[in-house]
Amino acid sequence: MESGSMKTPLVNNQEEARSSSSITCGLLLSTSVAVTGSFVYGCAMSYSSPAQSKIMEELGLSVADYSFFTSVMTLGGMITAAFSGKIAAVIGRRQTMWIADVFCIFGWLAVAFAHDKMLLNIGRGFLGFGVGLISYVVPVYIAEITPKAFRGGFSFSNQLLQSFGISLMFFTGNFFHWRTLALLSAIPCGIQMICLFFIPESPRWLAMYGRERELEVTLKRLRGENGDILEEAAEIRETVETSRRESRSGLKDLFNMKNAHPLIIGLGLMLLQQFCGSSAISAYAARIFDTAGFPSDIGTSILAVILVPQSIIVMFAVDRCGRRPLLMSSSIGLCICSFLIGLSYYLQNHGDFQEFCSPILIVGLVGYVLSFGIGLGGLPWVIMSEVFPVNVKITAGSLVTVSNWFFSWIIIFSFNFMMQWSAFGTYFIFAGVSLMSFVFVWTLVPETKGRTLEDIQQSLGQLS
């Protein structure tokens, strides 16, 4: 859900090699290892949903305590996200993923063996450090190893594995104790740590440090022995040199009229993605079913079943349907489904209609998950990689990523308190935000499908 809950950074997609646009075993292996991190992210994001009731009961946590435990991961993510671009640039993409796994393993172990809220929060915070790095480096790595012809679908494999992690946590959380669940969640981190030794470093990162021989060997591994990688290698070198010349701008250069439109798009989509309530659904799904009087084990299992197929469909649709239609359809769907969820809570207080509450809730939540997945779940990050000029990409990427984590923290921390205030009112607010998202996309977000980065950025600069 997150996306997003998981967070795709700003990368330069200008290189394209006509002779190397094929899918090879090396490319599939490297992508599979990288998106294991996305799976870890999905597990971490949704762990708090099935674990909530037992953790609160066994450790004697209040609603405020558990809200902080759930949201502290986003604070940790916000910290490392602010430096993730620099870290990945200095030590490399693979090494950054390896460090993220170390953080996550420590975090899961701390949660599993916690006997008080302090160690519980420390563990959740370390998970945040790990997924904050993952949210940046995994999409960067995939974008930099994938031929342009397949980049949209491969980039959405992020969303697919996040959804798979969320689904697995929703489903297995019905059968395992929360401590066992935390220990099991550390296993994918260890698997990725080992497998990272068997995949190549990003070709662009190698070019940045002048490692020409390794660059060519890596491209051969990714494109196949029969692939002609000379043109692609030359374009990577040219793009890296251009980035080196033009990326000296800082935060001051981001905030000027030329970049006003891209900045509004970036921050606006991040705010709307979170304020429609997506992080709350992932983090508190079981609690939502419980408070609505529907069995949480059945409800979360239903969500688990639909998440992965939905992500597979979107992965193949993103380069065919266009960004704007999917975003606007997603926004309208979220508006309708949030209203239905709110209506189910409202009807609980009216005896004549209580038998309709559970069916309306299920339809609303299933529709919400489907609607979020087709647009606002992953597409804001795809668009972010396309709208910012080269000279502010790193700065803009850090700002947008940190903003997304911050907006996510606001929703996750405040959700339980909002539900205590008014359950139906909370979802009516989410419905209103989703409607605002439709208007925002309709008026401000351009269609980027099939356009070059130069064309997109030039048109946005003229409008600013």
UniProtKB/Swiss-Prot annotation:
Q: Pfam families recorded for this chain?
A: Sugar_tr (PF00083)
**Is Nucleotide-binding among this UniProt entry's keywords?**
no
Report the subcellular localization: Membrane
Please provide one cellular component term from the Gene Ontology annotations of this protein.
membrane
Query: Which keywords label this protein?
Result: Membrane, Sugar transport, Transmembrane, Transmembrane helix, Transport
Q: Does the keyword Ligase apply?
A: no
Where do transmembrane segments lie in this chain? 23-43, 72-92, 95-115, 125-145, 156-176, 180-200, 263-283, 298-318, 326-346, 359-379, 399-419, 424-444
Topology of this chain in the membrane: Multi-pass membrane protein
Alphabetized SUPFAM superfamilies for the sequence: MFS general substrate transporter
Instruction: Please provide, alphabetically and separated by semicolons, the GO molecular function terms listed in this UniProt record.
Output: sugar transmembrane transporter activity
Q: Which InterPro entries match?
A: MFS_dom (IPR020846), MFS_ERD6/Tret1-like (IPR044775), MFS_sugar_transport-like (IPR005828), MFS_trans_sf (IPR036259), MFS_Trehalose_Transporter (IPR050549), Sugar/inositol_transpt (IPR003663), Sugar_transporter_CS (IPR005829)
This molecule's function is given as: Sugar transporter.
Could you tell me which PANTHER family the record lists for this protein? PTHR48021, SUGAR TRANSPORTER ERD6-LIKE 1-RELATED
Q: Belongs to which family? A: Belongs to the major facilitator superfamily. Sugar transporter (TC 2.A.1.1) family.
Name this polypeptide is given = Sugar transporter ERD6-like 1
Q: Which organism is it from?
A: Arabidopsis thaliana
Q: Gene name on record? A: SUGTL4
